[in-house]
Amino acid sequence: MLDLPPFIAPQHYTDADAALAQVRRIYDNSVAHLREAMRRYVADADESPVVRRARACYPLVRVRTDSANRLGNANPVSLSYGFVAGPGRFETTLTRPDLYADYYLEQFKLLLQNHGVELEVSTSTQPMPVHFSFDEHEHLEGTLSPARRALLRDRFDLPDLASMDDGIANGSHEPAPGEPQPLALFTAPRVDYSLHRLRHYTGTTPEWFQNFVLFTNYQFYIDEFVRLGHAEMANPYSEYTAFVEPGNVVTRRAGLPTEAVDAFGAMPPRLPQMPAYHLMRADRTGITMVNIGVGPANAKNITDHIAVLRPHAWVMLGHCAGLRNSQQLGDYVLAHGYVREDHVLDEELPLWVPIPALAEIQQALEKAVADVTQLAGADLKRILRTGTVASTDNRNWELLPGNQPQRRFSQSRAVALDMESATIAANGFRFRVPYGTLLCVSDKPLHGEIKLPGMANHFYRERVDQHLRIGIRAIELLRQNGMDQLHSRKLRSFAEVAFQ
């Protein structure tokens, strides 16, 4: 027997704010229902003789269109999202309207503007896993005995992987006859799953993440970012409002009052696997920096989850092996192509799919190098090389017999090699998140220059500060150029979903 909250039938809206308010109402009712049922279960206070399964479902938004054309007041040249691909019925489940309010509101407004149709909002038939209904600081299930915990599956819906795969993003999803077409890349359970994973891997809650993300594979960059973040907080005129570190430790800008949420922050006893740091702006266009560690598995893992936040761009700042003898230690490499020997995305994104360079990101990175180094023309080209970056899953590729990798890298015209950049770019392509890569040459193993401890430490001290300032400057340029220019139509498929 099911214990359900009241079902809310479809209601039609031509006002985006009203539609969002209804989404909130349905979501809040579902969450409250599951939390109360869990509290009764933990307290063993359910006196009903009949075993009742508590269930609540996510809100749903739907649009129906009769034409492939968009309204005359829409500019089809500038649009890369906000419209459906043709006539039909399109829908998606939604979650966390508190976190996604601005995002949902923009998507709703664009659909109304581009198609002139009504938005239908109702309760869906997709159950909400009880784990995804808990508040950030609630851990009710932790007090359950092993026997009671084993019975959870009989009383509540648990996460179901079948409802959260990436078929839509991968382009392999085929609706059955009579089923609606997707309106977004991610279903609500998939989003909730990643939001919970982000807490685990980064040590910070999703609310702190900003819309521009820098990835690095060295703690040296994080140390410098932390120093810069605290310096910004000491400046009462900084454009940034807060700096957040793992454990949700919040430092507010000088002159700003603390907020209630700050009291929950505490430095963790040890850093999480991929710690994240957030230099925040009031409009969420600040900078999040994540130390992803080493290897393509980490790179795929973190980008799989950050993608549900729909950032405006992510950029890899890391070290690489220079493959050309003409390169010097400390030179920069701006990737305009990738050799994917990482193998972690082969099933989701076939190797025959090219990963294009995105002009908006490339131009911002090149200008940032020029701005920070104060070089131009031939002097700039001397330290900045544009070319193909190869990424491998074999850290000791140099030891393979017969010069096998060297031959492939030469045939591909690669100028640099690392273990993460191609993965981050490929997942950006797969998830329609604008991406870029700017690496710094830290060794040249094909030419006898390998990393040694003393040399490496000196090199890091010399270059990390400048490289990070280049990355931050690139983000500033992207922000100044506007988000409308950033989301490239190069990332759209033939039958793209409407949501960004």
Predicted regions and their residues:
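Accessory terminal and edge-of-domain segments that mediate assembly/interaction
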Residues: 1-313, 321-500
